Amino acid sequence: NHHVGADSLQKLGSEAHNYYRDGFYAASQDAELKCPDVELNVLISIDDVTDRVQAVITPGTKPEEAFAARRRVMAEIEQESLAATGLRSDVITLYQGGRYHLYRSKKYTDVRLVFAPEQQIAFFGGDADNFEFPRYALDACFFRAYENDKPARVPHHLAWSETRVAAGDLVFVSGHPGHTDRAATVRELESKRDRTIPFALAMLNRLEVLYGAYGAEGPEEKRQALGDLFGAQNGRKSREGVLAGLLDPAVFARKRQTEARLRDLLARDAGDKPSPFERIERAEDEIARVSLRHNLLEGAVGFNSQYFANARTILRAAQEATKPTGDRLREYRDSNRASLEQQLFSTKPIYDAFEIVKLADSLTFLATALGPDDPTVKQVLAGKSPRERAAELIRGTRLGTRAPDAAAAPVTDLRRPLYDGGMAAVAASNDPLILLAQAIDEEARSLRKTVETAGEIKRQAHAEIAQAVFASAGEDRYPDATFTLRLAYGTVLGYDQDGRMIEPITTYAGLFARAAAKHDTPPFDLPPRWQRLRQALEHDQPFLETPFNFVSTADIIGGNSGSPVVNPRGELVGLIFDGNIQSLVLDLAYDDTKARAVSVDAAGILAALRQVYKAEALVAELRGPAAAAAAAAADWRPLFDGRSLAGWKPTPFGGEGEVRIVAGAIEIAQGSDMSGITWGGEFPRQHYEISLDARRVDGSDFFCGLTFPVGDDPCSLIVGGWGGGVVGLSSIDGLDAANNDTTHYHAFTTGEWYAVRVRVTPERIECFINDERVVDQPLAGHALSIRDEVIPSKPLGIATYATTAQLKNIRWRPVAPPTSAAESAP
């Protein structure tokens, strides 16, 4: 997504090149921009290591000892895997401790920017439309992964679909949902409702105001702050949605009912020992006792600066390096070193003025939350105001890549020598932020230990609950989200909102209508490039009708951004970028009544690349060699010149109506009963598409009965039959269009033109009305035929039944066969 790639756009950009605002396109690989500190991971394997992890915990082990033992064995597993495979290795906790799995991933760290749209079209509608639908956002970027300075060659990839999604389609989503609390206890949800979310909202509301005010100082300040502002707004709105669910009495009523059943199940074997639920409640009490200070000090909410983050990383890397890898804080294990170093040594420019504003505000938050007389606050502020102290710290540090400043002398970056020098270099350092990180480190570590120990108590309790559930109901219930790969499925489906039906698919026509309705005022204004092309685009009917965004019932949550949406053939049809406001309750429980995942449509992405950004090379690459070959051969070939019946002749049905040319169209007058035209020239039998526009002028039955060859067999597409509304193929396995699986009903308006298109390959027949797929009929195992009265239309003909119809734009084009068996596989 653009909003995921935004961090890279900000890091690559400058005052002169604002890629976040203005977009970017590399017309060749040489022009691609290398992104600082980006790491892409591709999952290779998953191994169950539950028995090995749980074996180190024996009955009676104290929680802090159990936590240390578990940390050691997980580090051992990760280190052994890294040494054996060279792959990134992470032990993941599932079911809150019921299962442990080892995930191995191939890592790419040379990642380059290929394309990004302007921020205004990627986030059209801004915060007002965020978590809403209908949406009109081109929230997509393209990056290329490299190995050994060459584009990575991968054995598997998703093909870009040539078919658009339609209402009712089945879709699948593979992605990394971040966190859910569906297995949380009532007490844990109460803590989230009463403590965790209110604290986060207080912080995010404050940051939203801060970043907005800083960005209002000028265009460069706006560029620096825009990504952080979006993050604050998005975080605020998402938590408000979760909080609304937690404040719903019905949600807690259902949760209490579920928990009561689990308590009864566990009580049978509990004896006199505290139940898992009671142990979780005590652990929550302990976390609540230290929560505020933990968030401010260990969570660094009170120290909002990239320079401070670098200082803490350098300090703790030196401290932890003196310990065996299994005894270290998790982020400093040997198996995580490469990722840590990539982040620490980012070349992203840091803007001192912005850092001072952020740090001053967070120090103010620290002082007001703990009180000005708190010993830690006094030590941190060192007798100065938050603003003065922030300026002193930022101007005195040398722990980052400073953005160029003509008024300031160059400053040597000390991150690498301090990191490589270990404890001796850190102990000798007088960098003010190293000294600050040292000053709060003992208390911060103590707070972390308290929370981790309580977390271990909860983990063991949840493991008992999970084992009880496994024993009684099996492992059919999937675990809460953990930022690891999950597969979800759903249907492209609208929903009712306040008595109004929300259709599941938006188009580019809707984008322009939305902008016009809002008088093109921010955040509903279009970027300059789109404004320049607007008049032409608004007269391009195929572009206007192209799907832009769509919703589905797929089970997603924060973290799914950028997840591919695929059809049953494994082809990419969209990209998840949001959920509607009703989807935020999915943190607590899945419900498909109104909750929807929001995607940008793959067809909409291609249309923008082709017609707005003129990125033909990228389009050809995305569609793949087979599709590119098809596109190269996709010049439509006319079957009607608009002036004569050349190549066509009236079909001798008997009782047929007159055929004539009227205003550039073929008019087939109503007969008794069938009338039509038959093609007398050459026509392919496979690998082709045929397209035409048809309309009913008078009558009440089918106005387009298109008979076409499928290899050696004929078939007919009936449009508007059996009283005027049936669409389908005649015949499949001896059953006509009204009685087989292709039967589809459509409300056709007399006098209105409809675009009819049929694609024939050896594998299937696909039929489209106004570019909406209405038939997708596989051929394997099925017999094709036509009704006896239609035989005069063979091999290619168009007929009507008791209806006057007009036809125009009759044409065909070849469809290139797959270039290999692998490419033809579904």
Label each PLM-derived region with a short phrase:
Residues 630-826:
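Carbohydrate-interacting regions of secretory-pathway proteins
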